[in-house]
Structure formats: C-alpha cells, structure tokens
Amino acid sequence: MVERIQKAGHAKHSDVERVLRDTPRHEFVPDADLAVAYDPWQAVVTHRFEDGRSLSCASAPWLVAAMLDQLDVQPGNRILEIGVGTGYNASLLAQLTGRADLVTTIDVDPDVTAKASQALAAAGYGDVHVITGDGGLGYPDHAPYDRMIATVSPWDIPAQWWKQLAPGETAGRPVAVPCQVSLLSFSRPGWR
C-alpha cells in the first residue's frame, strides 16, 4: 500500500511513511476484508444513516498520506482533528506527535466516537482525547493547537478554528479536505 502511495507522490515525509507502515489499518476497519482495508485508493465507509447515506469513513490511504504530508506534524505538536472517522488518522497523528494525549479528535455522532475510542484503546492510543461534539466549534479546552485537520467536508474555515490555532511565527497550520476529494491548505494572514 505505502509503495503504491509513494509512487503516486504521497507519503513524502519519512515519518508519514513510517507510521503508515507501522499501523495496522485493518484493525480500524474490522468489517472490511484485507484487500479493501489496504487498497490505497479506496475509502471504507464505516457508518451510515438509516437511509443508506454514508456518515463516516476511513479516508483512502493516499488521501491520508497527502493530508499528513501537508500537515507536517512535528514531535510535541498539539493537534485537533475534526471528524473522528475510525480513529485510524488519530492513531497516526499520535505517533507523529509522539504523545497520544496531545491529539484531540471530535465528531458529532456518539456512535462514531464510541467505536473510534474502542479502536484507539485496543491499538494502544487510549490517551487520544475523543470528544463527542460539534467540530465546527473546534474544541477550545485543549487549545491552542499547532496543527488542525478537518477530515470532514467543511464549506469554509469557521472563525472558532482560527481562534484556536497557536499564534505567532510558528502559527498553527490547518488542513481541510472538502468532499474528501481534493486537498486544500489554508494559512492565516501573516503565516508563511
């Protein structure tokens, strides 16, 4: 999976490559067979509304790698993830930052957060803060964040997110993925 992602130009950072190789993705998508779990181009839907529309998924591995490359997580960074999904991305973030307790992930659906909490604990990342709440409001209790990643489909960057990013020369870096298709990076005015 990782070699195919790298051939496509993602997982450029050695730390991103390492965590993708070291993390058993299939444990976060237990209902998917191994071929689907490790297909670099396929998202795995893990939760649906009653009418069949998808509510939550594990993003395609190529997209996960692209987001993490762009997020450029450094050891010790405090991170907010909007959109818990399966907990897979939070486990990667915990490894990149070096401490699971520096990662906060938030989702509005209690079933999604409960399953992600279980998967994270089983994988050894029970110290990740999994919050049930409105991700559009961010999570000020653990702010300021050095990095913020939205794995949901935001129409815009809410003012609350900007307020929760670390200020100054090392200002926080947000990455958002509209519609889980294209990757956009936003920077605050004055941030390089």
State the predicted function of each range.
Residues 39, 172, 187:
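Residues in well-ordered beta-strands of folded domains
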Residues 69-172, 176-178:
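Conserved nucleotide-cofactor-binding alpha/beta core module
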Residues 1-80, 84-85, 89, 112, ...:
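Class I SAM-dependent transferase core
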Residues 50-52, 162, 179-181:
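Short C-terminal domain-edge/linker segments immediately following a structured domain
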Residues 183-192:
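Class I S-adenosyl-L-methionine
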Residues 41, 62, 155, 161-162, ...:
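A residue-identity detector for tryptophan
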